[in-house]
Each structure stands twice: as structure tokens, then as C-alpha cells.
Amino acid sequence: LFFFLGRDYFPEIRSGVIQMHMRAPLGTRIEVSGRLATLISNSIEELLPGQIRNIVSNCGLPVGPHNLAFIPTPTIGSQDCDLTILLENEKSPVWDFRRILRKGLTERYPGTEFTFQPSDLTAKILNFGAPAPIDVQVNGPDMYANYEFARKLVGKFRDIPGAVDVVIQQTMRTPTLMVEGNRTFGLGVNRTLKNMADNLLMTTAGSQQVDQIYWLDPSTGMSYLINVYTPQAQINSLNSLRTVPIDSSVKSPKDEDVQLLGNLADLSAEGTPGVVTHGNIMPLFDIYVSVEGRDLGGVLTDVERIAKSMEHEKPRSAELEIHGQASLMHDAYYELIFGLLAAIALVYLLIVVNFQSWLDPFIIITALPGALAGIAWALFLTHTRLSEPALTGAIMTMGTATANSILVVSYARERIEEHGDAVMAAIEAGKTRFRPVLMTASAMIFGMVPMATGYSQNAPLGRAVIGGLFVATLFTLFFVPCVYALVYSGRVTRQKERAS
């Protein structure tokens, strides 16, 4: 059954919040993105009637780059908006709501990209700020070849069952005006490329981009930074850019020295990278893959299979790596499974020292397969995937199941030393230790019920403990005495034959 459970790192919880990212067509102005976000907010309330308490939208980039460093967001330009949807009921099934919104919004707003990020704090931490648990990175010196290869991977990844919101974080077709100055024309009128760039920057972004100008207030002695720029309403067309005056480094009051940008440079519309990410100095592209309706381990296996099959199409000197929460899940599973096996081995060795026997500890740990079977059935029947909390619960179950089994075997040893009948000793041990074993197991099972029936991330732990301990208790009371009787009846018979 363990192979049919599926694998997750940590289960998703019902937080009552949906975090959504909207990306309008590249180059959309900030005011248009804001109006579009308002329309989308209204559509969300229509798609989820009576389920929305409030929607907060945040469009565009912050004024300073320092604020962006502390906000885990895929926003790269004015066309991006982050929408935080607060639900009326904190226990609402956010995964079902995401499915409804993803389908409905895509149909209503073609050309706009919608992705969903984890809303609970644990998933955000495990993703290291990334918007998805799987981050496939293409890193290499040839940026354009890497981008085309990343697009091929995206097409393959979108066919994976359970893979949703498969997007490339970096864009390569952001609408941009390219101003290419003509050195020959510029030198003919005593203008350089620096003169063109300085005047264009001063007109569009302000004088502080070229040179900082301070004014000293003689009355207070305080200095004020003065920023001079052309009002944005006057720079609203290509013609207004072509008529930007370009002065020379040599000041002259003559009118014939005034030159326009359109006479000295060519303006053309092109598509350029919206954001450039570097890894080890080389350009890097992030392919984000989210998971919906399937376990993370299954989707990761398919992603790794496709990535391996596409190795021969990889650009020269490029590297393909998988990061994010999914890569950490492998290490966590290996460590927890090793810890589970190490716990069983250490418990066995400790019992060997205590009982001064290799056989009795083996009989004691025969209850542990029942615990594993109970864990598998409990997770399977409750539709709970295997996760780190579930494996932690398995380790807890091993200790309690072993302690109960020790009670039965230790009493059976006492009885067999008195009358020498292994079968009778096993029966007496099962009857006498029935109440203590049942009380110990019941206390832990009932104590885990609130956790198992809740919506926290530790719910798989409680379910694993309840299922594992329930079956392990049956094994302890019925199977372990049978194994003890079977093993020791043969030993007692051989000892009697040797004595005779």
C-alpha cells in the first residue's frame, strides 16, 4: 500500500487564504493593470459566491529595490499583480477553489496568466520564497538558446498529470523602445552619445539620474535635492521623444546649435528581457511547476524523467538542475527512513542487552510489521499521502509497539521458567498482559484523535500513530504469543530429548 499512497513533503493545510498572481500581456501599463485587477476581483466574487471576505491587490514594482528583496513575489514589471484572497471560512477547501478560479479566470481573460502560490507559512519557507515547490533551472552562457530550451521543457511539463501553473519566471519579449544614436550625425553637430543619453534620461526619469543638484536654503542652512524632469503627460508618443532637445557639452546661445533626438538617433520597438537572473555569473531561467490533485513525489518523478530525456537537446555548456521543496523532499525521506530503520535496530540491540538473548528480542520486534501495516492502511483509508509528519508518527509507533511487546514476552519468560510449557506460557502472557497493553495503546490512540481529525499539518502524524498502534496492539496480543509458543516449544522439546 505504501506505493499507492503518494509522497508529499508536508501536507497542505486549510489556511483560509488564497494567494494568486496575475500577469497581464507584457508591457501593460500600471494603470491598466490596476483596472484589470479590479475586474478580476469582481470575477472572483462571481465564481465563488458567498465565499470571499476581502481581496487585496498589489500591482507593479515597489519604488525602491530594497522592498522587493523582502517580498517573495514573481512580479517583474507593471503588468504583474499579486492578489490576496481572504475567505469567509478558514476551513474552506482552498485546493477546490483554486481549481474553479484557474478554469474560470482563464476563460474570461484570455492572454492573462494566472498562477497560485502557497498561502501557508510552512510551504513558503520550504519553497525558499519560490512560488512553486518544483523549480527547474536552466543555466548557461547562451541566454537565447537557454530560453528556447526552457520553452520546450514547459511544453513537456504541461502534459504531466497533476502539474499546473507551469511558467517561466523570466520574460524575453518585454516591449521596449530602442534608441540607437548615430555617431556620424552627432559628431557633425558636436554631439556625443553621452549627450543623447543624458538628455533623454533627464527628460524621462529626471535630472537625478544624470547629476544630483542640491539647493541650499540660506535661512535654515539645509540642503534640498532638486529633481527636474518633463511631465509624463508631455512624453506620450514617439514624436514627443523625437523632439527631445539635445544640447552639447559646449554651451552656446545660438539657436542653430539646438538639435533634436530624432535627427541624431533611430527609434525602434523591440522585445527585450524583462528581468535577467544570473547563477554562477551565467544567465539563468526558472521554470516553476506547481502540483494540484496529485502527490508531489509523483509529479517530481515525471519532471525528472522528462528532464533526463531532454538532455540531448540541451544547449552547449548549459546545466539543468531541479531545486525547490521537491529536491529537499528526497533528502528528508532518506533521512527519516534511515532513522526508522536505525530506531528498529537500536531498539533490538538494547533489548538484546537487557534480555541477554538474541531470540527473545527477535520475537518482540515481530509486532513491528503489524505497526507498518496499520500505518499503511490508516493513511490509505483516510486518503492521506505519505509525508514527513507521517514518517515521524511511524517512528513514534515503533517505540510504543515495542514497549507493549516487551511486556508480553517478559511475562512469558517468567512463566516458562516455572512450568516449562511454552504454549501455556504464551497463553498466560496474552491473558495477563491484555489489560496493561490495552490501556497503554488506548491512551495513546485516544490522545491522538484530536490531532488526526484536525486540519493541521500534524494530522498525518496522528493518523499514522492511531492506525499503526491499533494493528500493532493486535499483533502484540495475538501474533507475538503465537511466535513465542512456536519458537520455544521446539526448544523445550529438544532440551527434554537431550536430558533424556
What are these regions (language model features)?
Residues L1, L26-T38, Q457, C482-S500:
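Interfacial helix-loop-helix hairpins and adjacent transmembrane helices
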Residues L1-T28, H66, F70, S92, ...:
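Transmembrane helices with small-residue packing motifs
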Residues Y9-V17, P74-D80, T115-P133, Q137, ...:
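Flexible hinge/switch segments at interdomain interfaces of large molecular machines
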